[in-house]
Amino acid sequence: MNAIILAAGLGSRFKDITQSTHKSLLDIHGTPNLERTLTFLRQANIDNIVIVTGYLHEQFEYLKKKYDCTLIYNEKYREYNSIYSFSLAQDFFNDCYVIDADVVLNRNIFLTKPSHSKYFTVIRSKTHNEWLPILNSNGQVIRIDIGSLNQPSLSGISFWTTQDCNIILTLLKEYTSEVRLKNPKLYWDTIPMEYIEKLNIYTEQLNSDDIFEMDNLDDYHHILQKLTPNKEK
């Protein structure tokens, strides 16, 4: 099994704090957040871990030796969206997790290997333009809506079987034109979303205290309060 971690972003909504520290490396009670995720992946015996870096890429160098992971530098992180980051790591996209680097985990969700592709979902306390998977009676995702309803939304972590990886990789070339890569409204997740009927993907809903979104300083401070050391699992 593999894991691709997308960590090229600027984190501009954090203002001054991310001028000197990448948002995925912000400290969570003594440990950079990304190291928490890497520790969980190693505990789950994930074979190959690749981190796609960009902004402040030099800050990730120490992770190569510490966690035996691969770093890929996206030099176009300022001009291209995450589809380009994903394309740089496509050789690893096989029986694979894809993880947003700024996701904060409070539990190791990687210990049981999924039997099929899945989106990990969560009901967020605050909702705004969330990606909401719509399921059929068998629990299979048949489409993804974008909205602010109080229902399970994509958490920033997904798993893809080899079969679905191959389908997505075949579609990837449709998204690598300059126009699409420079469109800030497109993400790597846009590819499976627009071709969901070709994929065999389900969901696993996490508890609200299993996973947190870290989009801005308010989120960060909220997470620090929620994850006091004696509350962590």
UniProtKB/Swiss-Prot annotation:
It comes from the Bacteria. Pathway: Lipopolysaccharide biosynthesis. CDD domains: PC_cytidylyltransferase. Mg(2+) binds at D102, E213, D215. GO terms for molecular function: metal ion binding; nucleotidyltransferase activity. Keywords: Lipopolysaccharide biosynthesis, Magnesium, Metal-binding, Nucleotidyltransferase, Transferase. Its EC number is 2.7.7.15. It is an enzyme of class 2 (transferase). One of its GO terms (biological process) is lipopolysaccharide biosynthetic process. SUPFAM superfamilies: Nucleotide-diphospho-sugar transferases. CDP-choline binds at L6, A8, G9, Y80, S85, A101, Y187. Disulfide bonds: none annotated. It catalyses: phosphocholine + CTP + H(+) = CDP-choline + diphosphate. Its cofactor is Mg(2+). Belongs to the LicC/PntC cytidylyltransferase family. Cytidylyltransferase involved in the biosynthesis of lipopolysaccharides (LPS), a necessary component and antigenic determinant of the outer membrane that has been shown to be an important factor in the host-parasite interaction in a number of Gram-negative species. Catalyzes the activation of phosphocholine (P-Cho) to CDP-choline (CDP-Cho). LicC is critical for the expression of the 6A2-specific epitope. PANTHER family: NUCLEOTIDYL TRANSFERASE, PROTEIN LICC. This is Choline-phosphate cytidylyltransferase. The gene is licC.
